[in-house]
């Protein structure tokens, strides 16, 4: 295996040049931009793209000076993919757990002072369509001081979702739904933090306060 860094396709070499030397080319560049919600209030202070937050806590030099308001008790993460789960875990983990990770030092200090105690993960689709993987969703239940809360009605499949699940006949997909339904059967135990999953909900507006800061979200 050979690694070549600091190479920009289209600047240092072209796709045609790559094709001339390799039989197979795999593009794994990652998502560099976020999908906007296109709702009123999206540009208020306190509303951030996931890529900014992830780059910040991972220590990307272009993002280390970003400021995130962690003084509020509740935060919402819109999306039900692995990135959403990663963001939610960072917000929910204790400082002791974060210390064992490779999180940037400045992000650790900011999160150590965080007052966020409730994190909502909001999905526009249902549990069958959720994009997160089973290891990711299972790991949230292993965090030290977090109650994972899933409303039972939202993981009770309607006929269309059940038909899709049966049609796919995918054991991994069945297991994903089972994990969510297991969380739904658990009663909260009074832990310091709560991670709440909501399905089939769509943000329609972010409402700001007199300072232009996000105050609440309308679904």
Where are these regions (language model features)?
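Feature captures the FAD/FMN-dependent oxidoreductase FAD-binding
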Residues: 1-44, 187-190, 196, 204-217
């Amino acid at each position: 295996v050979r690694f070549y860094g600091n190479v920009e396709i289209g600047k240092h070499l072209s796709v045609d040049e790559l094709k001339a030397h390799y039989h197979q080319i795999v593009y794994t560049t990652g998502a560099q931009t976020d999908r906007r919600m296109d709702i009123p209030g999206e540009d208020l202070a306190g509303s951030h793209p996931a890529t900014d937050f992830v780059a910040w806590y991972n220590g990307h030099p272009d993002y280390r000076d970003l400021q995130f308001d962690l003084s509020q008790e509740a935060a919402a993460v819109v999306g039900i993919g692995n990135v959403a789960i990663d963001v939610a875990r960072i917000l929910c983990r204790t400082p002791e757990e974060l210390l064992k990770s490779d999180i940037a030092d400045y992000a650790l200090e900011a999160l150590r002072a965080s007052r966020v105690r409730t994190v909502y993960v909001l999905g526009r689709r249902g549990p069958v369509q959720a994009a997160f993987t089973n290891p990711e969703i299972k790991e949230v239940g292993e965090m030290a001081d977090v109650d994972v809360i899933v409303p039972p009605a939202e993981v009770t499949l309607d006929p269309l979702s059940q038909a899709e699940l049966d049609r796919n006949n995918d054991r991994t997909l069945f297991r994903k739904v089972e994990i969510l339904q297991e969380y739904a059967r658990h009663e909260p135990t009074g832990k310091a933090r709560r991670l709440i999953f909501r399905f089939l909900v769509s943000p329609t507006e972010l409402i700001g306060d007199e300072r232009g800061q996000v105050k609440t979200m309308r679904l």
